[in-house]
Amino acid sequence: MKRISRRNFLKVAGVSAAALGLAACGGSKSGSTATSGSTAGSTAGGVNTAGFTVQYGSNPETLDPALNSAIDGANTIITIFEPLLLINENNEVVGGQAESWETSEDGLTWTFTMRDGLKWSDGTDLNAKDFEYSFKRMVDPNTAAPYAETCLGMIDVFEEAAGFPDADGNPTAEPNPDALNVKASDDGKTLTIVLSYPCSYFDKMAAFATMSPVQQATVEANGDAWCTSPDTFVSNGPYMITDWTPSERIVLTKNPNYVGGWDSSKIVSDTITLLLLEDSSASYAAYNSGEAVLVKDVPTDEIPSLTKAEDGGDFYVDTILGTYYVSLNLQRDAFKDAKVRKALSLAIDRDYVANTIMQGTYSAADSIVGPGIVDESGYFHDNGNAPYISADYEANLAEAKKLLEEAGYPNGEGYPTIEYSTNDAGYHVPLAEYLQQAWGDLGITLTINKMEWSSFTPARRAGEYDVARNGWVMDYNDPSNMLDLFCSGNGNNDGKYSNPDFDAAIDASRVADSAEHFAQLHKAEDILMEDMGCLPIAYYNDYWLQSPTLKGTWHSPYGYWYLQYGYIEG
């Protein structure tokens, strides 16, 4: 996989032929010398320990680990919470709140042994029982956790625990969360999880931010509001929230009660301030003024003038495992015909989008599962039937017009006006404006609905849109993480795609046999792309500005910034 990154990056890990090897790209580490962006304060050995300020998103939709599905929320969650296991800076699974773990010979029983002396940020004790509570809370349909099936679906008795959900994810029987086969020992020292089928990447799942524990006392005392105020926000990671001004900033302070897998001797900054900015111009100004030492939202019109890190600059472009796609609301009559969906897809010049609109910071997509995702022998993208979308745009456009006519809409006649919903950040609005023109060439009228980030994602999840920009960054390196999104009833299936053959292929992939696992996932992707259940647009890169003064942080192939060890040099 092509990577444009800084000097001290971790290279793509070797691909293993072992079942679900989960090799992945390593992330970018922080660079050299020193200047602005720190909080005034003490220094020790050339290290400013007071703190630093960054921007990687606006107001988070939620910081409840069970409810979050956005990358900006996850970036904060991995700093203030800690799951059973962690992914370290070398992309290795290491102990988090669990000091060790073991798996039975049949691969079904996972036993985690907790560290001694674990504490919540309020100083109260934490043990395996808190994880049992948190996982059973997540499986409860009343929690409405979008990742419940992805994270817990392989655990024994999941279906009963979730109330035997139907194709839309709604329970068909009384849910029984306590039935989920997750059990803490009486002394809280061990957590035993029994799976319904072997899942060799379950250690990576146990390191996923969504699998972080939440404190039962504060959740039950404060309801959904528990995670909206520092007064009620209890966490267990190396930092905790001490100040939160919506639309302005969140201040994280070093957690004095932290016990866990991160090296406490490397957690040196007293505070990390997160600027909650949605306007990329404001983010850029914060960086140029020295207020922030890292900003993710860079104005796209500034990119041509920026100097890349490998050329001695402070602009970084780093490949991540994910796909930018467009969701069609398949519950709308306008999109029920696969010929229409294919026409809309074929009318998009993806090379123009990636290289002109997105200025080469993304790569044109020809499938939903992109490069870098491993297969039994190599990469899934290379071993499958991609490209599903030809690079010959002129031929594609002619085919699009033909399909639209076959669907009963010659030159778009009789087709309803449709609306494209997006938040206004990065390339989202320029892409929407391009789609207006591209689909206009088919005779289709597209309007644009620009929304605030905090309201956009709930509306998309609720199906309150016609067409919406979407995307997915992988949580672990297996194609199932991307393809599972499109299962009937999946909480992240925003387009409400549903095909029994696709679901059957996904179900058949949940086996210990590696060859069969990947064969069924290839079959599932074939079905999804033949249906054009979503419109793949581009493969993700992250791009950001970072001052050379910021040390100790790293960027992962899953789009996360790890700030735990961050500090300002000088």
Q: For each predicted feature, which ranges?
A:
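Structural transition elements
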Residues: 239, 363-406, 425-429
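Detector for C-terminal structural segments
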Residues: 15, 245, 347-380, 426-436, ...
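Aromatic- and charge-enriched surface segment that lines or borders ligand/interaction sites
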Residues: 99-153, 192, 334-336
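Surface-exposed binding/hinge segments that line
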Residues: 113, 132, 139, 143-217, ...
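Gly/Pro-rich hinge or "lid" segments in bacterial periplasmic/extracellular proteins
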Residues: 88, 92, 167, 177, ...
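Ligand-site clamp/hinge motif
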Residues: 208, 224, 257-305, 445
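N-terminal lobe/hinge region of extracytoplasmic solute-binding protein
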Residues: 55-105, 234
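A bilobed periplasmic-binding-protein/Venus flytrap-type ligand-binding module shared by bacterial periplasmic
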Residues: 88, 253-259, 320-343, 347, ...
